[in-house]
Amino acid sequence: MATIGEFTLHATDGKARTGVLQTAHGPVRTPIFMPVGTVGSVKGVAPDDLDAIGAEIILGNTYHLYLRPGDELVARRGGLHEFNAWRKPILTDSGGFQVFSLSGLRRISEEGVEFRSHLDGSKHLFTPEKVVSIQRNLNSDIMMVLDECVPYGADKDYTARSLKMTTRWAQRCRDAYPAGSGGNLMFGITQGGFFKDLREESIGELTRIDFDGFALGGLSVGESKTEMMDILYHTAPMLPAHKPRYLMGVGTPLDIINGINAGIDMFDCVLPTRNARNGTLYTSAGKINIKRREFAEDDGPLDPNCSCYTCRTFSRAYLRHLFHAQEILSYRLNSIHNLTYFLDLVRGAREAIAQGTFAEYKSRYDAIYPQEAALCP
């Protein structure tokens, strides 16, 4: 019987890897894309929809769930899996990114970060110990440590000071929940901005702490694609090879392909569902905007190469009509398709790595998104 936290690599192709991470709520095959369920639900879709399209793990947001409905209320309901009826694994972030995005509404100290709720202005304090407590109440399969995500453009002195504090916070998180304490896994988050030596320092310090996996944080925060790829390809291979590697909040299909190429195992992003609500849909021929007049009488499927419910059942003309009529069904059908696209991408990557053909697989996506590919290795 597999042990919770066990990460087994099944194949590699260059730096790309495929394997399985065992969690309390089942296995997660990597590389994997995690749909984002900020407040406990993935926008526009139900758990049955997610199950039908092959989602294996979703993400919840500690900050938002703490403020509403409250982590203690969720705990009284039996945890987030019971509360939202998603029986497979859940990863919760620490809420740090959201808190630091509040800018003028927060204050950072060694103790933690004090902030005011965006809902009612009430004052709160997130300490490393507090965010662990919240996530244990949520009973997520994977908990993330509290970290400071420094803003893009922060100077090296500030980034270095922030990094040292983030490392101390990471140790406090682990002290609050030692390895092997229960069924919840805990990942550390490497930081360091866009300074390679600080990134290396962060990895060196964090890997001395016994985390179950490691994340690259602080990317996709306003930098250019070239800058992001430079840090990604430099740092990803430095993360422990025997632990899962997670690229937080990134990104486009080509970002994910490049992340896999650099040795990353796990991804999350709001892009597929956010773009679905805006009418931007991903297809095997690239992105299309379903709002456009050219689709008004198009009886063909959204993507003839996709087998999702949306593509099997409805025409582009109908999807365009739903969007312009502002029907809620539009959000659901578009989200089902976009999420299927992202999940098919990582499913195909797993197969290509196992077959030793990932370079060829990557080249297909480079051809679909040539302008973006020109900015990537």
From Swiss-Prot:
The active site is at 93 (proton acceptor), 268 (nucleophile). Its EC number is 2.4.2.29. Its cofactor is Zn(2+). It catalyses: 7-aminomethyl-7-carbaguanine + guanosine(34) in tRNA = 7-aminomethyl-7-carbaguanosine(34) in tRNA + guanine. Pathway: tRNA modification; tRNA-queuosine biosynthesis. It is an enzyme of class 2 (transferase). GO terms for cellular component: cytosol. Residues 249-255, 273-277 are annotated as: RNA binding. Homodimer. Within each dimer, one monomer is responsible for RNA recognition and catalysis, while the other monomer binds to the replacement base PreQ1. Catalyzes the base-exchange of a guanine (G) residue with the queuine precursor 7-aminomethyl-7-deazaguanine (PreQ1) at position 34 (anticodon wobble position) in tRNAs with GU(N) anticodons (tRNA-Asp, -Asn, -His and -Tyr). Catalysis occurs through a double-displacement mechanism. The nucleophile active site attacks the C1' of nucleotide 34 to detach the guanine base from the RNA, forming a covalent enzyme-RNA intermediate. The proton acceptor active site deprotonates the incoming PreQ1, allowing a nucleophilic attack on the C1' of the ribose to form the product. This is Queuine tRNA-ribosyltransferase. It comes from Oleidesulfovibrio alaskensis (strain ATCC BAA-1058 / DSM 17464 / G20) (Desulfovibrio alaskensis).
